[in-house]
Amino acid sequence: MNLNATILGQAIAFVLFVLFCMKYVWPPLMAAIEKRQKEIADGLASAERAHKDLDLAKASATDQLKKAKAEAQVIIEQANKRRAQILDEAKTEAEQERTKIVAQAQAEIDAERKRAREELRKQVAILAVAGAEKIIERSVDEAANSDIVDKLVAEL
């Protein structure tokens, strides 16, 4: 056999093999490759969507956290204002109660002082009468004794 005929036979066999492969082997391989490329592309797209969704969820969570912090701050401020208001009201009530108690105590003191003065006046009057009786018993001079009694009464 001649080398040219062998090469020609091999070339024809190779061409037939290539045609056979292109007709029967290549399409299923290409279909499998395209299917795999599509799956990979879908997976990448899904991962990208998931990443975007994660970013949106993070942004949403951050916004909600900021809103919650702002609401908490508002609630704290309102509570502080209410606390201050309650303290002011309590101070005002305590001051009014103190004033009322002091006024009652002062009134009781004044009443007790008046009662003591009246009691003292009564006792002084009794003593004055007793002294006057003793003076009268010693001397019957009413003019001299009445001056003394008048002076005692004036002092009261």
Curated annotation (Swiss-Prot):
The chain crosses the membrane at residues 11-31. GO terms for cellular component: plasma membrane; proton-transporting ATP synthase complex. PANTHER family: ATP SYNTHASE SUBUNIT B, ATP SYNTHASE SUBUNIT B', CHLOROPLASTIC. Belongs to the ATPase B chain family. One of its GO terms (molecular function) is proton-transporting ATP synthase activity, rotational mechanism. F(1)F(0) ATP synthase produces ATP from ADP in the presence of a proton or sodium gradient. F-type ATPases consist of two structural domains, F(1) containing the extramembraneous catalytic core and F(0) containing the membrane proton channel, linked together by a central stalk and a peripheral stalk. During catalysis, ATP synthesis in the catalytic domain of F(1) is coupled via a rotary mechanism of the central stalk subunits to proton translocation. Component of the F(0) channel, it forms part of the peripheral stalk, linking F(1) to F(0). The keyword Membrane applies. CDD domains: ATP-synt_Fo_b (cd06503). The gene is atpF. Its main location: membrane. This is ATP synthase subunit b. It is a single-pass membrane protein. Disulfide bonds: none annotated. It comes from Citrobacter koseri (strain ATCC BAA-895 / CDC 4225-83 / SGSC4696). F-type ATPases have 2 components, F(1) - the catalytic core - and F(0) - the membrane proton channel. F(1) has five subunits: alpha(3), beta(3), gamma(1), delta(1), epsilon(1). F(0) has three main subunits: a(1), b(2) and c(10-14). The alpha and beta chains form an alternating ring which encloses part of the gamma chain. F(1) is attached to F(0) by a central stalk formed by the gamma and epsilon chains, while a peripheral stalk is formed by the delta and b chains. Keywords: ATP synthesis, Cell inner membrane, Cell membrane, CF(0), Hydrogen ion transport, Ion transport, Membrane, Transmembrane, Transmembrane helix, Transport. It is found in: Cell inner membrane. It comes from the Bacteria.
